């Protein structure tokens, strides 16, 4: 390559790298520069003003029973037998 072509390629690569490095990452709920919106800050301050206690809605008894129900245990002999590979053997 001629020196002119090498310089052009280097300038293009530098521009691409600078574009990637200087671009800002936008996440959900965040503004550029890592700042949150004022509405979320207000809600956080209000919650802190209540003593940090957040009231949760009451659960129905069916939801509580579903959450506390134990898993079904199919087989207590949970060891691995290398010789027995298939169920029919």
Curated annotation (Swiss-Prot):
Residues 1-23 form the signal peptide. InterPro entries: GnRH, Gonadoliberin. Keywords: Amidation, Cleavage on pair of basic residues, Hormone, Pyrrolidone carboxylic acid, Secreted, Signal. It is found in: Secreted. The modification Pyrrolidone carboxylic acid is found at residue 24. The keyword Signal applies. One of its GO terms (cellular component) is extracellular space. GO terms for molecular function: gonadotropin hormone-releasing hormone activity; gonadotropin-releasing hormone receptor binding. Belongs to the GnRH family. Stimulates the secretion of gonadotropins. PANTHER family: GONADOLIBERIN (PTHR10522), PROGONADOLIBERIN-2 (PTHR10522:SF6). This is Progonadoliberin-3.
């Amino acid at each position: 390559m001629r020196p002119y072509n090498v310089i052009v390629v280097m300038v293009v690569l530098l521009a691409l790298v600078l574009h990637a490095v200087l671009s800002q990452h936008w996440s959900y709920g965040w503004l550029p520069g890592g700042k949150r919106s004022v509405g979320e800050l207000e809600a956080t301050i209000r919650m802190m003003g209540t003593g940090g206690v957040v009231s949760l809605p009451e659960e129905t008894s069916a939801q509580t029973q579903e959450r506390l129900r134990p898993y079904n245990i199919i087989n207590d002999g949970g060891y691995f037998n290398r010789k027995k590979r298939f169920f029919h053997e």
